[in-house]
Swiss-Prot record:
Name of this chain's protein: ATP phosphoribosyltransferase
Encoding gene (name): hisG
Description of how the protein assembles with itself and partners: Heteromultimer composed of HisG and HisZ subunits.
Record note on domains: Lacks the C-terminal regulatory region which is replaced by HisZ.
Any one GO biological process: L-histidine biosynthetic process
Disulphide bridges: none
Coiled coil: none
Cytoplasm is among the record's keywords: yes
CDD domains: PBP2_HisGs
Record-level Gene Ontology MF annotations: ATP binding; ATP phosphoribosyltransferase activity
Catalytically driven reaction(s): 1-(5-phospho-beta-D-ribosyl)-ATP + diphosphate = 5-phospho-alpha-D-ribose 1-diphosphate + ATP
Function: Catalyzes the condensation of ATP and 5-phosphoribose 1-diphosphate to form N'-(5'-phosphoribosyl)-ATP (PR-ATP). Has a crucial role in the pathway because the rate of histidine biosynthesis seems to be controlled primarily by regulation of HisG enzymatic activity.
Natural source organism: Synechococcus sp. (strain JA-2-3B'a(2-13))
Length: 235
C-alpha cells in the first residue's frame, strides 16, 4: 500500500528465453525494474515480481519461449513483451498484427536473409528456378518474400539447424537469421539477400496499453532516456 492507497495490480511483461534475455533484463534494470533472478542458474521460477518499482508501479515478468511472447501479449496474459522483430514478422506474416509495437530497443541485432551454397550456380534468390526448395524456420517470412518476387518455391519447415538442408541436398537455399555469418561460412553457405533487419522490440496488448497508458508511457520515457540514451552515448 502506498500513501494509504491499495496497490494496483502489477503490469506483466513477457520475456523471451535465450539470447535476448540478458539484455532485456539489463534494459529494464536501467529503469529500475529488476528481473535479474531469471539469470540465476539455480532459478526454476517462470513468473517473478520485481522487488523494485517504477514510480510506484509494480511489475512482474513471465519467462516464455521466444515465439510465445507475442501470444501471451495478444491474449492479454501479459500487458507488455520484449521480443525480436523477426518473431513478430513470422507470427503475423500475411495478417494484421494483433499487438502494438511501442519501441525499438536497439539490441539483438540480426537480419533475416537468403543463403545459398557457395557452389550454387545462382547468386541471388531471384535467380532460383521455379519450385526450388527453400528450408526455413521462418516459413511465413520466406513465403512473403518469394511471393513479392513472384517466384513459386517449395518451402520446407525445419526446427533445427537449417544449414544442414543444402548440405544434404534437401534444399537449394535457406532463409534464416544471420548475425555474423560465421555459421553460414563454416557450412559452405553465402548470404545473398537480406529480407529485413531485426532488433528487440517492446510490444503491448492494445487494450491493456489504453487501460495502463500512464505507467506504460512512463516506462517508455524512462527506457528512451536511460537505456536508448546510454546506447547513444556509448555508441
Amino acid at each position: 500500500m502506498l500513501d494509504g492507497r491499495p496497490d494496483s495490480p502489477p503490469i506483466t511483461i513477457a520475456l523471451a528465453k535465450g539470447a535476448l534475455l540478458p539484455e532485456a533484463i539489463q534494459c529494464l534494470q536501467q529503469v529500475g525494474i529488476d528481473f535479474s533472478r531469471f539469470l540465476d542458474p539455480g532459478n526454476r521460477l517462470l513468473r517473478i515480481e520485481s522487488p523494485t518499482r517504477l514510480n510506484g508501479q509494480r511489475y512482474e515478468a513471465l519467462l516464455v519461449r521466444t515465439h510465445d511472447v507475442p501470444v501471451y501479449v495478444e491474449y492479454g496474459q501479459a500487458q507488455l513483451g520484449i521480443v525480436g522483430y523477426d518473431v513478430l514478422r513470422e507470427r503475423y506474416a500475411g495478417t494484421e498484427a494483433r499487438v502494438a509495437h511501442l519501441l525499438d530497443l536497439q539490441f539483438g541485432h540480426c537480419r533475416m536473409s537468403v543463403a545459398l551454397p557457395q557452389d550454387s550456380p545462382y547468386h541471388s534468390a531471384a535467380q532460383l528456378p521455379a519450385h526450388a526448395r527453400v528450408a526455413s524456420k521462418f516459413v511465413g517470412c520466406a513465403r512473403e518474400y518469394f511471393d513479392r518476387l513472384d517466384l513459386p518455391v517449395e518451402l520446407i519447415s525445419l526446427y533445427g539447424s537449417v544449414e544442414l538442408a543444402p548440405l544434404t541436398g534437401m534444399a537449394d537455399a535457406i532463409v534464416d537469421l544471420v548475425a555474423t555469418g560465421r555459421t553460414l561460412r563454416e557450412n559452405g553457405l553465402i548470404e545473398r539477400d537480406c529480407l529485413f533487419e531485426s532488433t528487440a522490440r517492446l510490444i503491448a496488448h492494445p487494450i491493456s496499453y489504453r487501460v495502463n497508458q500512464q505507467p506504460i508511457r512512463e516506462l517508455i520515457t524512462q527506457i528512451r532516456e536511460r537505456w536508448l540514451g546510454s546506447l547513444l552515448v556509448g555508441g
